Amino acid sequence: MLLVPRVPVVMQGKCGLLKISRPLQGSLSRGFHFSRAHRSEYDEEKVVIDEINKKLTPVDIQNQQKLRNIGISAHIDSGKTTFTERVLYYTKRIKEIHEVRGRDNVGATMDFMDLEREKGITIQSAATYCSWDKDKNSYHFNLIDTPGHIDFTIEVERALRVLDGAVLVVCAVSGVQSQTVTVDRQMRRYNVPRVTFINKMDRMGANPFKAIEQLNSKLKLPAAAVQVPIGAESELKGVVDLLDMKAYYNKGDNGEIIESGPIPEELKSLAEEKRQVLIETLADVDEHMAEIFLEEKEPTIQEMKDAIRRATIARKFTPVLMGSALANTGVQHVLDAIVDYLPNPSEVLNTGLDIAHEEAKVNLIPSVQQPFVGLAFKLEEGKYGQLTYIRVYQGRLKKGSYITNVKTGKKVKVSRLVRMHSNEMEDVDEVGSGEICATFGIDCSSGDTFSDGTLQYSMSSMFVPDAVVSLSITPKSKDSTNFSKALNRFQKEDPTFRVRFDPESKETVISGMGELHLEIYVERMKREYNVECITGKPQVSYRESITIPSEFDYTHKKQSGGAGQYARIIGDLSPVEGGNKSNVFETHVVGGRIPDKYLSACAKGFDEACERGPLIGHKVLNVKMLINDGAIHSVDSNELAFKVATLTAFRDAFLKAQPVIMEPIMIVSVTSPNEFQGNVIGLLNKLQAVIQETDNGHDEFTLRAECSLSTMFGFASSLRASTQGKGEFSLEFSHYAPTAPHVQKELIAEFQKKQKK
């Protein structure tokens, strides 16, 4: 029987009185049973991981324990590239610090593209490795710095797919912003645990505890500080560690020397209060910590560390550290936290699909004794040819060995194997399980799985979001060789960048995640391929759908001497319930009235019809086609006839089903100084945006609203004018919604006018 004290429990410890609040007592009594009755997803994974680890050799275990694959993610301008620069400096990977935007004519190490250094944003994920010494052990980090801008979200997806943990960088002034929410969603999709670093503590208006509240409320992720700052804004001096209750200060020209001392008198009560909050939060998410409470004990430093590690790896909690990368404060503590709280490769469950056995799910074993399995997660065109980044999940990859592309069955030789440091590389002979490396001369696509040829394992590919913006592009010169070469390379590197030729306008059309995304590629074409282009006005990627069911009974006949064409299909079109953004094709034909080979042709016809809708030629969304009857002719029926019949029946039924044009609805997040709040709200009202929430800070505000993408072109210059250049914004796709009736009429009229031309 479980006994819970009915009065507050007070415990005397070296850090003062530790009192459990009444709400916590309730959560402890509930949580003790709750954690057993409702085991988290990770609890189930842990059972499998423990079984896998029994198969590892002592050497495997030792190698894995010293390895961390870490990503650094954040909202744009939260300071993560500056943070990464300090990490490289403190781990002795670079000898001097350079700043973002190339202010010193050098630029941040990880921003190696000229465009990145000019614009001060990270466009591609740069990979590097470094070592960090802690407790007389050397730990090896594979580190990836990812873009914060929403237009480059595929780079974040690629990084998280192959990482075991992440550092989430949050601005102390702005707190949780729109892209922070997006990154959180991506981390959850790939089950990536994270530690959080609240950066820019030296900025005016810095409020780390408000940011922690937002982590709890907006991200619905239990979070608690493991540090409190010593001073803030321009008076930031260091941090207090809430586990060992000591003060730490960064000294030296670049903060490379760390000194410790007693907690300043004025911070003792705050430190004790926040330490208790940390312990209470841990007791809510960790069974062992809950037991310590119920036994009325004060947790030791090691017990707290262990609880933080367990809860973080289980994705139930994130420890929050704080400091300022630009002011060289607090970064080394984050490196310690990566070692202490984030998982090594043997603590993460990675699975594949065994193609040889009907895609049965298989667990990958992070041992060099196992057959090789790796995932190509990123492609780059380098000066020595195509560079392919590979995460090794099982076995080892050796220079000179042969590996097989599981998708194509093609065998290739690993002629050169390198570890990357930004755009520089270091040759290696071999990499083991859990490592990230790169190789040359392998023809593949992003997301392909490689093996040693004995296994046919495939790993699930990265999530690729739909493109929402398109524009026409034409080279100024008639020589189109480099133009085609550039487009082919960019498509291969970036799955969210798409190219198609419009037969009506005779133009090449590129599509992507936003205006900036496409602008960057147009600029890269000019710089890297010497191809200047003329671009058209950005176009919205609309979708077409229906609102009511519609039946069809269509017969396709064609007779022109000799064998003709005959196909009859009967069925209906209907909207897909739930709006899951997919189209569905089903057949319920009985008695063999339509043979399977003809039904397969119907499915191809349906897919083709969905690529180009009847209203304005855009893709079709949320439509289900059911064929339940039909007829064939013994001589004239063939696959082409049934495909054509499906295309025509689809079009006719679609137009009778009260069709609608759907437009992308975006979440716009605007941050600006407080004095421009009225201007920004007025600007959004003109665009008929629906304001969802406003977050007022010390000297700036953040506003989130829903608006149609079609109204947002040119918003950057309007915002600049309304805020004297001090406002910034980001756009993220939310969902598709029907356009206004008058807009639909205009779009259809415009499309029909083009058709006549």
From Swiss-Prot:
InterPro entries, alphabetized: EFG_II (IPR041095), EFG_III (IPR009022), EFG_III/V (IPR035647), EFG_IV (IPR047872), EFG_V-like (IPR000640), EFTu-like_2 (IPR004161), G_TR_CS (IPR031157), P-loop_NTPase (IPR027417)
UniProt: GTP binding residues: 74-81, 145-149, 199-202
Main location: mitochondrion
Any one of the GO BP annotations: mitochondrial translational elongation
Matching CDD domains: EF-G, EFG_III, EFG_mtEFG1_IV, mtEFG1_II_like
Transit peptide start and end: 1-39
Pathway: Protein biosynthesis; polypeptide chain elongation
Name of one Pfam family that matches: EFG_C
Gene Ontology cellular-component terms listed: mitochondrion
UniProt record similarity statement: Belongs to the TRAFAC class translation factor GTPase superfamily. Classic translation factor GTPase family. EF-G/EF-2 subfamily.
Protein name (record): Elongation factor G, mitochondrial
Species: Candida glabrata (strain ATCC 2001 / BCRC 20586 / JCM 3761 / NBRC 0622 / NRRL Y-65 / CBS 138) (Yeast)
